[in-house]
Amino acid sequence: MFKKVENKANFPKIEEKILKFWNDNKIFEKSIKQREGCEEFTFYDGPPFATGLPHFGHFVPNTIKDIIPRYQTMQGKYVKRNFGWDTHGLPVEYEVEKKLGISGKYEIENYGIENFNKECRKIVLRYTEEWKNIILRLGRWVDFEKGYKTMDISFMESVWWVFKNLYEKGLIYESYYVLPYSPKLATPLSNFEVNLGEYKEVNDPSLTIKFKIKDKNEYLLVWTTTPWTLPSNLGIAVGQEIEYSKIFDKTKEEILILGSKKLNSYYDDENSYTIIEKFKGSKLEGIEYEPIFNYFLEQKDKGAFKVHTADYVTTDDGTGIVHIAPFGEEDYRILKKHTNVDIIDPLDAECKFTNQVKDFKGLFVKDADKKIIENLKLRNFLFKRENYLHRYPFCYRTNCPIIYRPISSWFVNVEKIKTKLLEVNEKINWMPAHLKKGRFGKWLENAKDWAISRNRFWGNPIPIWICSKTGKKICIGSKKELENLSGQKIEDLHKDQIDKITWPSKDGGKFIRTSEVLDCWFESGAMPYASNHYPFTNEINFKNIFPADFIAEGLDQTRGWFYTLTILGTALFENTAFKNVIVNGLVLSSDGRKMSKSFKNYTDPMQVINTFGADALRLYLIMSPVVKADDLKYSDNGVRDVLKNIIIPIWNAYSFFTTYAIIDKFKPPKNLSLAKNNNLDKWIISELESLKKILNTEIDKYNLTKSIESLLEFIDKLNNWYIRRSRRRFWKSENDKDKNDAYETLYYAIKTLMILLAPFIPFITEEIYQNLKTDEDKQSIHLNDYPKANENFINKTIEEKINLARKITSMARSLRSLHNIKIRMPISTIYIVTKNQNEQNMLMEMQEIILDEINAKEMKIKANEEELITYKAKANFKELGKKLGKDMKAVSTEISKLKNEDIIKIINGTSYEIKVANAKHYLSLNDIILEREEKENLKVINEESITIGIDSLITKELYLEGLTREFVRQIQNLRKEKNFDVSDRINLYIENNETLKEMLNKFEKYIKTETLALNIILNKSKLEKKINLADDIFTLIGIEKC
């Protein structure tokens, strides 16, 4: 026997009850244990940082990461789900710096690296309990107890093994290179870390500087937007094919050289200068000039202070001449190619000038701009000063401007394996698919060598020891290897401990570790190996869990985790690290901005869950464009709408079934037969079996959008067609076979639908299942197998028939709404136009249903529209414009004059001739735009190949019937307001008026049947509610139980 179900459910409370049920009965653990020994489905969980609380952006991938493993478990596979934590790196260090009130490398070293790392270890798992509570409350099943942490010694050791493998393959090298650098973090960043940050519009000073050509009284006008790089100037670049002009400036009385195209930008008056000569940039190549600062004069003998040609120089901005300093990637490349200059980097770890540039010592580079400009102006080198608005990258962790500078770093040689990376990408199933060739594929095509070292403290140390005497390098791949070489016991692999480990070399020197730590992205990319402590343990099983069958994260990870996984998987095994990936977009606030606590532009996620329930939030996110890697403007109202339009209708269907099943004491049979006689039963069973087929196909393809759409379509069919059209079968008093078939069918449909929905909305499905399950059923809905389609009960013919009837009904309802004809007001006739003979036959079979649904008395089927409308035509300028030219206007006029019969001929395929002047033109249907004019009293609508019309003339008899239907509806509402049971018989009290008399004379039996009224009584004292039957017709009613 089923328990009674309340019409109004408190879904958050239900979810908390279900969480307790899962925990008390260890349902998650049982779901995994029952699949032990089955085919494994491998899932990698990308590790988040636990230094902040989860937000809506985390909820999307976490919902996806719950849906797929639940589904695959129900498909009979063994799916381990262990959570992971990213515990190293810049985010953690930055939090500790804020906590301690210190900043930068020097202050950390003064505080003590060991003390600093202890603080990092304390803070790194600050919010793990909050994460655990929120993720579990979202309904995600994941094992936090067996989760991995990147700071675990076992994890760190496997990362060393990965590093050594790459080192031995020649894929690791150390070099100076111009890299993006965070001054506040005092470390270089990788290119993809730069892309994780924000590019802001900034106003930088734009300078034009005079550089004097050696031994001549002539000046090169050189342009720059980075004044702070000028003290390190080592060269000048021009475009080889750009034309330059040597001019005499009459005002300054100086000879100047600049791009010819830029003369108008620098001189308003052509008479203020004289052109001496014009020449290509190639003529300037090799010319020496006098440096504007004397800090690095010793570099002159190594090729500094000369003009070079470069492809990147243009005349789009500035003068067409730019200065070269080793702070730009292209600049650095040209200096390496054409000179032997030393690597110049007069900046300390925080990007302040060192003593090498004594005039500006101690100044942060951006702050030094003003002083440098003053210096140049004072010494008459400044020709022009302006401001330049451009986009500039800012550090994704500290929000400070990124500085590009030459710095020693360790690299993965990505260029060397680029071809293989592209091959590996072809093996990956991307969802959405466009990312394969698009965002991710393009990123791989342009991939640069990956700077993996960080000049920081809390991270996995680069396992390379270097001989202090010879420079010989030894790369360590395990803890044991280091113990054997050093003769010391190793307890921890972090920098503060491992840097103490040294040993003598045979050459009389000492092996000392290189000071850097690894980029934390290297660790997350090594997660498939390190989380399993491969190859030190689990070596046999590893082949079964690599590559992953599935991963999921946000779009930003195409340049983050997806990228590093792919690089390391390719470098180690020439294989992808994952076979399938679902990529979600960004979750923004409702105003389209980034969600921010300071902006206060979003609701606390737990408040949303506690208001609407986790199921509603999950469904809202999965239904949205965010699952297709598009952005979502999050709205609480969107979650509310999902609750109202999807979750509650599911509950209502369940409530409807249990209400009547309890009344009739329905008990589901042990062997429920799907062979039914009623067409509605056959149809909903067929639709359900078809749905199973779609879901098994689409979820296997990781197409959650199509899966959800199919589920929602079925929910609509179940509620708004099957149940609505079957109500009378449940209402009737006799328990015949048809009624029992209706119970069995609805029971089967709801229970099966819950199992199909279970991976998506795990709470409400469990709640409903617990009331519907029999003694033979599994303890939890999530312990079931995912339903497979029974092809024997898929009946496409009956699906087509009823779906056609539903389409006609939908069109008719739209037409009524458009012309303000209420659905309870009967109409005399519906006209349906289709040329398709099969559709005509199906419509005849469905006539009774269609008439009932649209509240019409008669249905007429036509093959042509002409009986409903007359045609008018306008010229289709898009089509005709291509072929008519100057005759277009005249032909357009003639088209507007076409008669109805002429247009019908064109519709039927006849080519229609129009004469304009001496030319003949022939019109086809594509050349005209049809306009339909309805005939008198008809309202017409067209959708694809079907046109329908309704007779809008409402006779007195029809009007009275419409009022009666509205009268019944108002009585039903009053029953609900008074919490009457659906089976309660009533006395109906009415007042004495002419309208009610007419209604009762004609429709008394109908009113009694629909409202379960045994008696209709005139009694003023019992009247309790005033109701509105039409615009100006009111009456009073009252009801009481018999």
Swiss-Prot record:
Signal peptide: none annotated. A motif ('HIGH' region) lies at residues 48-58. It catalyses: tRNA(Ile) + L-isoleucine + ATP = L-isoleucyl-tRNA(Ile) + AMP + diphosphate. Keywords: Aminoacyl-tRNA synthetase, ATP-binding, Cytoplasm, Ligase, Metal-binding, Nucleotide-binding, Protein biosynthesis, Zinc. One of its GO terms (biological process) is isoleucyl-tRNA aminoacylation. SUPFAM superfamilies: Anticodon-binding domain of a subclass of class I aminoacyl-tRNA synthetases, Nucleotidylyl transferase, ValRS/IleRS/LeuRS editing domain. Its EC number is 6.1.1.5. GO terms for cellular component: cytoplasm. Monomer. This is Isoleucine--tRNA ligase. It comes from Borreliella burgdorferi (strain ATCC 35210 / DSM 4680 / CIP 102532 / B31) (Borrelia burgdorferi).
